[in-house]
């Protein structure tokens, strides 16, 4: 979702590297060591994936062929992308992305496979997207828009309990530009490019 790009102040404890300390591979896995009550969101941790992740709702007018419709679509995309990171379900996020944007689609596919195989991602709920300035019309119905991705860490946990932690050590590297155009079904992202930082 669009929100402050400040890094979270705390992180979950580092999962133990010893396989014996990893959560058991048998039976269901629950964050917080137990099944959350219906409707209670519980973030992912070393014990299991996120539970009861709120499902985003697309805002009215997000498919309209207007600048306002485009901006609503891009913000909806960030919400569905975060939802996918926490659940492995990128069904809606795919709809905002061109089939030619292979790197983005491959990222969705990899996350979906991780969840399908019994793994999960820790830290997905803390990722934020801050769109900067106004979108720029590049001609022929194509717009570009700068955005900042705020995150401090991501941990992927395999079904066997083995984990991999990625840390964000350079926030200046998190500026991107996307380009988007309109089709009959709505606004579609054509490219996502990391902006070169000035030195």
Spans of model-derived segments:
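N-terminal short leaders/motifs
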Residues: 80-88, 129-145
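Juxtamembrane and targeting peptides
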Residues: 1-69
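Polar low-complexity intrinsically disordered regions enriched in Ser/Thr and small residues
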Residues: 35, 42, 121-122, 126-127, ...
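A mature extracytoplasmic/lumenal domain signature
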Residues: 97-100, 108-109, 126-127, 148-151, ...
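Core segments of small alpha/beta cavity-forming domains
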Residues: 45-122
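Intrinsically disordered, low-complexity segments enriched in small/polar residues
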Residues: 25, 30, 37, 46, ...
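A short, amphipathic edge element
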Residues: 116-134
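Exposed beta-sheet edge and beta->alpha loop/turn motif
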Residues: 1-11, 16, 21-23, 28, ...
